[in-house]
Amino acid sequence: MTATDTAVRGNDLVDELLGWLEEHWDPDLTVGEWWERLGLAGWAAPMLPEDCYGRGLSRGDALRVSATISRFGALGAPMGMSIGLASPTITTHGTREQIDRLVPPAVTGKIAYCQLFSEPGAGSDLAGLATRAVRDGDVWRIDGQKVWTSGGQYADRGMLLARTNPDAPKHQGITWFAIDMHQPGVDIRPLKEMTGHAMFNEVFLTDAEVLDADRIGDVNNGWAVANTTLLHERSGMGARGGGAGPETAYLTRMARGGSVAGDLDKRAGDFVTARPTTATKERSKQPSSPAQGHIDLAREMGVLDQPVIRQEIVRAHILGTVARLNTERSKASPVPGIANLGKLLMGHIVRHNRDLGMAILGARGTLHAYDDEQRGEMAKLPGGKGAVAATAQALGAQALPIYGGTDQIQRNIIGERVLGLPKEPGDLTTLPFNQLPKNA
């Protein structure tokens, strides 16, 4: 397929979506009502297969859908793991009954998922997890601890990895479950970060229960299922392109999915600032720079004419474009390691964008808003909301090279699985889990 063919197909997709938005977007709908329209039409999770509540689109086209919805002035799909991680994992490894039962509430925002993978003793070495699942008839009983659980305090279900056979090698005795987070045996404790937010949580599981009907994939084959989840996580990170402009340009604040956050019954139009107009529709078709957020911020701060700032903005545009093109390249045929390379690149991009944002803000960058009241006050200062976002990005930039698999893990995967380099010495992958050496 040529670049011209891709562009034509992209324009056709945008035209179809804009026509649908003109007919169906209504800011007076509740968030839940709007997301149900969006999800059941396949626009909320367009990468899912057409028979699984999606449209079978590539990641590049899915990003185009997201940007078009935002620039049109409508509320986008539910953010988070329900659409990006849980749904594609379930559609890949689940039964037809599980797909029809679990995917619709996820893509329509009725329930929110979190990821119960990492543990205090199993982060980079995820297969070393110790959380146990013991079968009791049609129920599995879960005991263990998880940590760095993003959005756990808002989750209805968790993507749980638990050890179901400690006598097997560590990669072979793991099973993937969709666990109900609303039960007495699940204790969620938020972890406040230096940004002022509590994105992460630690989760204690004490005789918690999960039905065997909510087991995704075969017993003890959870590592293969988890690799699907991780592939989508890393691919999603690598496809962002570093942009901070058009995808969030019309959001006043983010709407959260699920029953806990309380956004489903709120008015959808209260989460966006733009209404559909002819000008907005035409703007939806125009390509935008991955560095658009920094361009707008530099203009607001009066430094757009400074040569060094302009040079680094161009660098941000180039890096973001390369990330997008890597995603486009992977559409033609599977590229080994492309998700890992993409995540490595995104780690570099967020750190570059952190430094660029601080260079644009100058002394203004020393001020950060730690709560909603402070954010409202600081949005009135030079730089506005863009400055508030830039300081938050600066404090959070180092997280991406760590979560979802550290940069070092990505390089190991590329070296061993793509380049065929020897594995690290001391490989213990064939030993049964209960014979592995452990800290006292």
Predicted feature residues:
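Alpha-helix capping/hinge segments and adjacent helical runs
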Residues: R9, R55, N340, L344-A440
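Short glycine/proline-enriched turns and hinge-like loops at secondary-structure junctions
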Residues: L57, D125-A127, G151-A155, K170-G173, ...
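A structural signal for short hydrophobic beta-strand segments in well-ordered beta-sheet cores
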Residues: T131-V134
